[in-house]
Amino acid sequence: MKVIDGTIASPLGFSADGLHAGFKKRKMDFGWIVSEKPASVAGVYTTNKVIAAPLIVTKTSVKKAGKMRAIVVNSGVANSCTGTQGLEDAYTMQEWTAEKLGVEPDMIGVASTGIIGELLPMDTLKNGLSKLVVNGNANDFAKAILTTDTATKTIAVTETFGRDVVTMAGVAKGSGMIHPNMATMLGFITCDANISSDTLQLALSQNVEKTFNQITVDGDTSTNDMVLVMSNGCALNDEILPDTPEFDKFSKMLNFVMQELAKKIAKDGEGANKLIQVDVVNAPNALDARMMAKSVVGSSLVKTAIFGEDPNWGRILAAVGYAGVDVPVDNVDIMLGGLPVMLASSPVTFDDEEMKDIMHGDEVTITVDLHSGQEKGTAWGCDLSYDYVKINALYHT
């Protein structure tokens, strides 16, 4: 597998565009991804009981059609908690896009992110849609889906399947309300592989637990979380089938793309200065390891300690203990950046200058060794700074 300098439109047969329609005052806020032919599609959605209107529309269409031609996205207005009118507007958003592309409405996915409780300004939407073009600027799409993010989040890779080269690309947004059980988190992945929707869903479902579901910024789960994968077969490879070496290769490719996007989201948490990676190793099973890793990275006390560059192993051990995992914790090792701060559940002395260098970096890795098995789990998050409170205190409803 090779990482390339690409965009969400790098896979064959895809294009994208983004622009400023007026959902926000100045920044880009509207865009789409278009496949030249019907693409296989798979999705995962928020576990929040309050589900935004666009998710209802998209989830229903994915289930009904099993194929997708385009995804249209606005930022600035979430169209969540907007009742019957909000749902009607989401369907209208889908229908207008379908009319412009000359396809059936169920072939269109819709997504929104932004302020909860506001209806979509439909004149703004219609005007923006009239200006979107096929084969537009894919980099602008990555900008158009952002809200409080400080940077775009993209990744593109290639892999060979027999004599054919398959390209996969991803784009995401997310900075606050990131605690998916799957944040607001939106993720879109395009691919030109020949793979059915059912097989694509299998690959997505297998990998989401190890990637997007393992990030947390603030413990809040958004009403609008969605990850969609489209694969249109334009690479002309032999169909990828379950339980084959080709499926395993495709799954690893998808896992890499999703993991890179997840890490970019965690690193760009609201007000964040540092990316935190927690590796729980030598656990009895992978699920327990992932739960424990997420408990540590989600601890507000751990996050504030990392912000303050304090190697506070006590807070880490406390988060290990309340993770809800039935694992002995009387022989735990804890390392910060590879430097031991606890061995066999007892503190150890360490070199202060070496630790200062580790804690001062913009990425801090915490390793928790349970000595009770052979499985591993990883989670990602960020530190908790003064700016997080400031950003969310000023964000209006």
Swiss-Prot record:
Catalytic residues (UniProt): 184
Major localization listed first in the record, in broad terms: cytoplasm
Positions annotated to bind substrate: 147, 173, 184, 270, 392, 397
Gene Ontology CC, one term: cytoplasm
Coiled-coil annotated spans: none
Gene Ontology MF terms: glutamate N-acetyltransferase activity; L-glutamate N-acetyltransferase activity
Pfam assignment, any one: ArgJ
GO BP term, pick one: ornithine biosynthetic process
Cleavage, annotated site positions: 183-184
Catalytic activity annotation: N(2)-acetyl-L-ornithine + L-glutamate = N-acetyl-L-glutamate + L-ornithine; L-glutamate + acetyl-CoA = N-acetyl-L-glutamate + CoA + H(+)
EC number: 2.3.1.35, 2.3.1.1
General function of this protein: Catalyzes two activities which are involved in the cyclic version of arginine biosynthesis: the synthesis of N-acetylglutamate from glutamate and acetyl-CoA as the acetyl donor, and of ornithine by transacetylation between N(2)-acetylornithine and glutamate.
Family, per entry: Belongs to the ArgJ family.
HAMAP family assigned to the protein according to its UniProt record, in alphabetical order: ArgJ
Name by which UniProt lists this protein: Arginine biosynthesis bifunctional protein ArgJ
Biological source species: Streptococcus thermophilus (strain CNRZ 1066)
